[in-house]
């Protein structure tokens, strides 16, 4: 609510909706210049397969609703996909041409990508897909997952920590959306990540060093699965070493914070 009030003070008109109730948002589409779909269904507690199915149900319903509405009134749609669509590729560099073999967190988005791209080709849906890495910035999931757990003495590296994570500062992600909404590169996908993917252990160490805290240890994946859920852990231990060259080349995008170490002081 406070965030909404802050936006209203900036002149933003809010339209509050429910992902599972299309009537609460589909009528807004004809009134805007473009639709940017960044919504994700929120769940609480341990991530189970059933909860992942709830996330997929919500995303499928909202994405299909928005794509139909955008087709009906010829509006541009920016769809937020994600790097989990690619699945585990070890040390290999991943580009937009890399085949999708999603980890659990990427299954719903992959399903929608496979629907949206044919709609772009065959029915001329004006859609552009953005695939952000793990987003960090003040507050949000980053604060919950890293800062809060570190303060409680609960932060741990998942498994061996040798898998790559590709990340992005929230301000750089916003800049990419601003460029994409002005683009006419319909049917294209852009990976939005910084210049330096990090192994998970290095990412966590960079964070604890910046906080002036003692480096943390690792936790076995089997124990993590008991605590937070198998599908989530299977996603977080995948290796996604993502290239951002296409977004730089075609959108003219350049991350202000090219590495995690550069961006942390601003957080």
Where are these regions (language model features)?
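NAD(P)H-binding glycine-rich loop region in Rossmannoid oxidoreductase-like domains
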Residues: 1-64, 69
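Conserved C-terminal active-site "lid" loop/helix of NAD(P)H-dependent oxidoreductases
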Residues: 201-205, 225-254
């Amino acid at each position: 609510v406070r965030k909404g009030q802050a936006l209203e003070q900036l002149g933003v008109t809010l339209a509050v909706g429910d992902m599972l109730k299309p009537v609460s948002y589909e009528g807004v589409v004809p009134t805007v210049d473009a639709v940017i779909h960044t919504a994700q269904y929120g769940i609480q507690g341990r991530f189970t397969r059933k909860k992942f199915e709830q996330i997929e149900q919500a995303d499928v319903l909202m994405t299909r609703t928005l794509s139909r509405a955008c087709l009906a009134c010829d509006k541009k749609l920016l769809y937020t996909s994600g790097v989990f669509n690619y699945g585990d590729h070890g040390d290999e560099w991943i580009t937009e041409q890399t085949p999708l073999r999603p980890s659990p967190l990427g299954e719903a988005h992959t399903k929608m990508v496979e629907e949206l791209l044919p709609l772009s080709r065959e029915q001329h849906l004006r859609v552009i897909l953005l695939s952000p890495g793990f987003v960090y910035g003040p507050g949000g999931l980053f604060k919950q997952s890293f800062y809060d757990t570190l303060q409680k003495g609960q932060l741990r590296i998942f498994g061996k920590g040798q898998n790559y994570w590709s990340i992005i500062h929230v301000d750089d992600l916003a800049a990419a959306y601003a460029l994409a909404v002005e683009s006419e590169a319909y049917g294209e996908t852009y990976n939005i990540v910084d210049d330096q993917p990090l192994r998970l252990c290095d990412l966590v160490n960079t964070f604890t060093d910046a906080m002036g805290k003692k480096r943390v240890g690792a936790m076995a994946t089997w124990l993590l699965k008991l605590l937070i859920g198998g599908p989530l852990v299977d996603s977080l231990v995948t290796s996604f070493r993502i290239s951002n060259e296409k977004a730089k080349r075609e959108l003219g995008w350049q991350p202000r914070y090219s590495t995690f170490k550069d961006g942390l002081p601003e957080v």
